[in-house]
Every structure is written in C-alpha cells, then in structure tokens.
Amino acid sequence: MDITFKDVSYTYQPGTPFQGIGLKHINLTIESGSYTALIGHTGSGKSTLLQHLNALLKPTEGVVQIGERQITPETNNKNLKVIRQKVGMVFQFPESQLFEATVQKDIAFGPQNFGVPEAEALERAKAMVELVGLPEAVLEQSPFDLSGGQMRRVAIAGVLAMQPEVLILDEPTAGLDPVGRREMMGLFEKLHREQGMTIVMVTHQMDDVANYADHVVVLENGGIAKSGTPREIFADPEWLTSKQLGLPTTTQFAQALIKKGFGFPKVPLTEHELAAMLRDQLPQGAGGANE
C-alpha cells in the first residue's frame, strides 16, 4: 500500500493570532514495503507529517493518498476508520497509553474497537505477546507491574494486534538504554523483513537511520530539504551540519580517518562496512599475528 503526498500543506490554527505553518507543498511517495526515516531538527515538520499518515491531521491543502483512499481538507472523519486500522502509529513513550487491568485486555482493546470479536482479539493478544518477545505469562499481569521496556513492548503489541500494513514510529527508542534500543529496533527490522511491513520512522538516532532505513527524508521549516538513500544523505556532512543534523557514529569516524589520509570508495554507514574498507587498505598480513 503506497502512501503519496500531493502538494500537501498544513496550517495550524488558521485565522487566529497563533496561526503557523506545519507543512508546505510536500510531494512525497512512501512505497509499499519500504523503510523510511524522517529526520530534521526540532520544529522541522516531522511529527506533523507523521500525523497525516493515518489521518490524525488532514491537509489544509493538497491530497494524501493512502492506498486507494484519499484524504483532503473536506474528507469526513467518519471515513477515516479504515485508514487508521491499516496504518498503526506508535507514539513517543507509548507505554503512557496503557490503561486496562491486564496485558491481554490492553492488547485486545484496539482490535475490539475496530469490530474484531472478543475471542479473536484475545487470541491475537497471545500471538502479539510472543511476537514482541514477552513470555505468555505476562498476559494476566497488570501492565503497570512490568518494567518500562516491557510496558513499551505491550503498547507496541497493541498496535500490531490491529494487523496494520504500515507502522508509524515516532522516536520509538526514546528513553531506552542501548540494549533496549537495539532490541526494539531489531523487532521493527524483523517486522519489515519477515512480514514486508512498511515502516516510517521519525528519529534523531542517525545510527538507526544508517542501519535500518532504505530511504531518508530531511525536513526543514515544514518542507522537504532533501531525500535519498542513507548513503546519499550522509555523503555530505557539511550540509547536514548546516541543518543541525549529525552523522552516524561510523561515518563520523570515517570522516576523521579521511583527514588522516585514508580514502573510501563510498561513505561507510556501518561498522562492518568500515572494517571491510579498512581491511582492503591494510598491507596483507597486517590484521594481526594470527594471519
């Protein structure tokens, strides 16, 4: 299910003293099965764009096409339910939205709200708990008795239980330690790889952009400043710095090596890529005493 923005603009509180531009003339296609990262400094329009993906916001001008359905300024809110079932959104700190007495009931709430029979929704909850890496025993526990990382997994399981085709992630690893962040990103990569799920992620973690995304959109002042593959975007560190954006850790290290005289055939994005490129530049046998 492709998502297309056709000359989309959005104005906050139009006609009031608080009027502000959220998006301006966005033209963008997010292809089915892709993994897209939205990056930009605070206030660039990332979250505003994200909320158009499942019609939490409707465009002030232009058209958002989600699969076969169009969202325009005139679209009736009653027609948005199907879209919100197909496009699941994981907000920042989603664990704050947990409310049911047990984990199973909390996960089952979303599907039931969309008309899934209770018995089927409860079965989905069991399957989703396993999918997000939690033991079945947590189903009867209160979500508020779990650790912060477990609570976040429960909240994500609730979104996945609605069987969305597109998963929208707003800073999904915010507040997690490095191990928790790696596990969470591994879960999303598994969904993308094994189920072909389309993923759109807002993040400030450039390492995650380099390791997981296949397309990057850079937003600035409500518009698209640049888009391309991670390698294309991170190939110009000076431009990124001018936009108050950083580089992946590996790419930063490679830039330091370039200043020391090393050369690379392309921008290394991951540790494995950098190691392979450095290995090619070392004299044979220089990798260690065992070689």
From Swiss-Prot:
Enzyme Commission no: 7.-.-.-
Record domain ABC transporter: where: 3-246
Residue ranges the record marks as coiled coil: none
Compartment annotation: Cell membrane
CDD domains per UniProt: ABC_cobalt_CbiO_domain1
A single cellular component GO annotation: ATP-binding cassette (ABC) transporter complex
Pfam families in the record: ABC_tran (PF00005)
Keywords, alphabetical: ATP-binding, Cell membrane, Membrane, Nucleotide-binding, Translocase, Transport
GO molecular function: ATP binding; ATP hydrolysis activity; ATPase-coupled transmembrane transporter activity
Enzyme class name: translocase
Membrane-topology descriptor: Peripheral membrane protein
SUPFAM superfamilies per record: P-loop containing nucleoside triphosphate hydrolases (SSF52540)
Positions that bind ATP: 40-47
Assigned protein family: Belongs to the ABC transporter superfamily. Energy-coupling factor EcfA family.
NCBIfam families, per database record: ECF_ATPase_2, PRK13634.1
Functional description taken from the UniProt entry: ATP-binding (A) component of a common energy-coupling factor (ECF) ABC-transporter complex. Unlike classic ABC transporters this ECF transporter provides the energy necessary to transport a number of different substrates.
Quaternary structure note: Forms a stable energy-coupling factor (ECF) transporter complex composed of 2 membrane-embedded substrate-binding proteins (S component), 2 ATP-binding proteins (A component) and 2 transmembrane proteins (T component).
Protein name: Energy-coupling factor transporter ATP-binding protein EcfA2
Source organism (scientific name): Latilactobacillus sakei subsp. sakei (strain 23K)
Organism lineage string: Bacteria, Bacillati, Bacillota, Bacilli, Lactobacillales
